């Protein structure tokens, strides 16, 4: 507010479909409000509409880098001939999602759930959960087509080989999934602030880029129903892939910086030029 009173431009960047309280309050005085989700615009004060830019969410996209699927699969311990389901529960992993997947694989190995033929799982457990997940898999006889890792340093490389993802619905995660055109099953974190992950997941499901499942109602059986539907329908996956890419803006950082530079005295050029 002090910056607005002093005539200093105020720029905000909102990453979620439901704008946070700070964004909703300060947007009244903002010169620019950059949003990642077009759905968030309707939740901002009417007076701020002219200053709103649907710019996307700044993420790290490697420039001029080619990803060879065969080589990357080999590097990750995956079979290049099988499609890849990527499961990631956030930077620290998710105990709830890990337990869900463990129980699903246990039922799969016993024959009570589909084996999802032609697919393999790359499971990012989180560092603190990796040992317990591996121990559980060992007790199941170390099922094939399941590869666990504690953490991924180079997520763009992994996203480039993922054919389907199971994930939380945080702003950065969903932005990366959209940028790489990865169809996804989104399971929002129930305790996220203002339930923003729920809003993100619902927005992406409405656009056709994802399937939204609630953790409280989820069982291994219901997760497998969605997995079977997707893994057996390449046409559906392709439509979701196109919908995801349509939602993405991998140049978001450049777009936002370009708009900010326009506010500087004596500058009116596009840094993208």
Q: Language-model segments: which ranges?
A:
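Short alpha-helical segment that forms part of, or immediately flanks, the ligand-binding pocket
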Residues: 1, 156, 174-182, 202
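Active-site-proximal region of nucleotide-activated glycan assembly enzymes
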Residues: 4-70
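Conserved donor-binding/catalytic loop of nucleotide-activated donor transferases
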Residues: 6, 160-162, 178-187, 207
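Donor-nucleotide binding loops and adjacent catalytic segments primarily
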Residues: 70-74, 78-165, 198-201, 213-222
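C-terminal alpha-helical cap of glycosyltransferases
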Residues: 249-273
């Amino acid at each position: 507010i002090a910056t607005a009173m002093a005539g200093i431009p105020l720029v905000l960047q909102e990453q979620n479909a439901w704008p946070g309280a700070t964004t909703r309050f300060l947007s009244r005085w903002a010169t620019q409000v950059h949003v990642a989700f077009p759905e968030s615009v309707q939740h901002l004060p009417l007076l701020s509409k002219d200053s709103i830019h649907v710019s996307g969410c700044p993420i790290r996209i490697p420039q001029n880098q080619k990803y060879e699927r065969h080589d990357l699969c080999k590097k990750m311990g995956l079979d290049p001939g099988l499609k890849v389901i990527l499961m990631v529960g956030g930077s620290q992993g998710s105990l709830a999602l890990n337990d869900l997947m463990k129980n699903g694989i246990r039922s799969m190995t016993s024959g009570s759930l589909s084996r999802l033929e032609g697919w393999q799982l790359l499971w990012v457990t989180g560092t603190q959960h990796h040992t317990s997940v591996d121990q559980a898999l060992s007790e199941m006889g170390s099922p094939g087509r399941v590869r666990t890792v504690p953490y991924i340093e180079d997520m763009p490389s992994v996203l480039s080989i993922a054919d389907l993802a199971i994930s939380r619905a945080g702003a950065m995660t969903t932005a990366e999934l959209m940028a790489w055109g990865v169809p996804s099953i989104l399971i929002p974190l129930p305790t996220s602030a203002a339930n923003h992950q729920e809003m993100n997941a619902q927005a992406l499901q409405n656009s056709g880029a994802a399937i939204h499942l609630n953790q409280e109602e989820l069982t291994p059986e219901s997760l497998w129903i969605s997995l079977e539907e997707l893994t057996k329908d390449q046409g559906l996956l392709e439509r979701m892939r196109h919908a995801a890419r349509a939602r993405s803006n991998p140049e978001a950082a450049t777009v936002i910086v370009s708009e900010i530079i326009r506010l500087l005295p004596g500058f009116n050029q596009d840094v993208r030029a």
